[in-house]
């Protein structure tokens, strides 16, 4: 595959994440019935986003923590030229300490542990065990696709 095509597809995943996340905020935490009531004809523009207690925390068109954290991963990869878990953890923690808009309780609890930046996996395990192994946050799934794209882009660029 030509480098320019790879670059365009890679950038497309970044823009797609941000735009999709900003539009997805319109229905985040809503039931199907609420979505049907507030958006009977779907949603085509940020101006249509209902301003309830959850959504009014963001300006219309803003993305959520999902894109912020994806950008932390991207910044880390650009700086380190590899997937560096400790650098990503440091960037996540810095983002959290500077507002961390939309951060979930489980993610906050993991990052708030004192040794999170030196051992993020252990911090996550501690919080998971403290919650009796019932937490099922899915943020890792959201970010995995981007990490996979970063690795694929890097691999194809080298070959």
Question: What residue ranges belong to the model's regions?
Answer:
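Structured, active/binding-site neighborhoods that engage oxygen-rich ligands
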Residues: 1-159
